[in-house]
Swiss-Prot record:
GO molecular function, one term: DNA binding
Record's protein name: DNA/RNA-binding protein ALBA2
Example of a GO cellular component annotation carried by this entry: nucleus
Residue ranges, annotated region (Disordered): 84-121
InterPro entries tied to this protein: Alba-like_dom_sf (IPR036882), Alba-like_NAB (IPR051958), DNA/RNA-bd_Alba-like (IPR002775)
Domain of life: Eukaryota
Species of provenance: Plasmodium falciparum (isolate 3D7)
Amino acid sequence: MPGSTKSDTKLENEIRISYKSDALDYVYKAIVLFETYDEIILSGVGKAISSVVNVAEMVKRRAKGLHQFTKLYEKEHVIKREDNSGLKKNAKNEDKKSGDEEEEEEEEEEDEENNKNKEANNRTVEFITTVPCMKIILSKNEDKIDKNEIGYQKPLDEKEVNVMTPEQILKEKSYRRRYRRGGRGGDRFRSYRRNYYETSMWNNRRYEKRN
């Protein structure tokens, strides 16, 4: 199957998923890509793995005949941090110096400047860690499919699929956003519900049930 797990270059039919973004944005991109390509690749790293699975399931329920291949692997991630421990030690040593050593300081200024320059160049520390990664390949082309491959999943039943166009997905996204905000009259309903539970009538009913 295409889609190497070792390459870091993004392919034209690949969608890299972040756990912070809205899943419907990626679903929209996937449906648009299926108009040009027979298969797409959904990829994610670390916390985004659960988002990759979620997006793949949403796409499979909006497009018919999608065969799925799941790839799990690890890759090295380099973290760069600044090490200021050397500068802190120099600051402590300067505080401990007495007034009798002022004459010696003039002679040591050049040496200290050279040492500080060396420390400034060596302040960056690199850490190499391994992070889990996932790639899910969704394919419409049945001729190039090896159904015995590890990680293969057959298409969903047509009864479970509701085919949608990119325009319909955008409408679904706007509807969900409106529904989350409460829509028309949503704020009034929430305020009514809050006031109802804060009234004495509700408290009296709770007292009667206890007795």
